[in-house]
Amino acid sequence: MSTDKANSWVYCEDFVEEDDVLLRARERAAQLGCAPVLPGAGAALSVLAAAVGARAAVEIGTGAGVGSLYLLRGMPDDGVLTTIDIEVEHQRAAKEAFAERGVRSTRTRTISGRALDVLPRLTDGAYDLVFVDADTESYPGYVEQAVRLLRPGGVLAVDDALWHDRVPDPARRDETTTVIREVGRTVRDHEQLLPALLPAGDGLLVAVRR
């Protein structure tokens, strides 16, 4: 990456300043060992949620609630975020972030469990936005479920879509990079999705459900 390009990326990441609530959520994420969405991708999530007026959203991978806060920022006041994580400690940290933000309890539904067990129980076509930010090996299954869950006009967002800049390099063939690269191709070629790959954060793959 050229110096100018790197500087532009840093500028974009810092363009929307994070407040103290988000910064504390990031600190808790670091303590728990989970990697939250980066600021540029988070800001993009807020914009996407606002653009589609997301009253019902699903987050796969709660972490410490950083991505959740960005989604809730863009959702209308009556919007409900369903967020799924297998780690109870993660959800406890996220609830702390929600309380600090003053988010009403009726605006979030936290579900503890394996996302691939939980997602099939959610209603077809009932969601405006699905955000994937969990174990990368399960990304193919998450994307398949997301397409089912989204209403026409709903938005899919997949974090870490460039995976430390490894995805664009065909010589990189480790398991994680290969899975994410294939997910990108699946979304790109899916007849029901209109996709774009944004260089925000560590790459944000987005698509609109036709």
Locate each region found by the language model.
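A short alpha-helical cap/connector motif
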Residues: 1-129, 136-157, 161-210
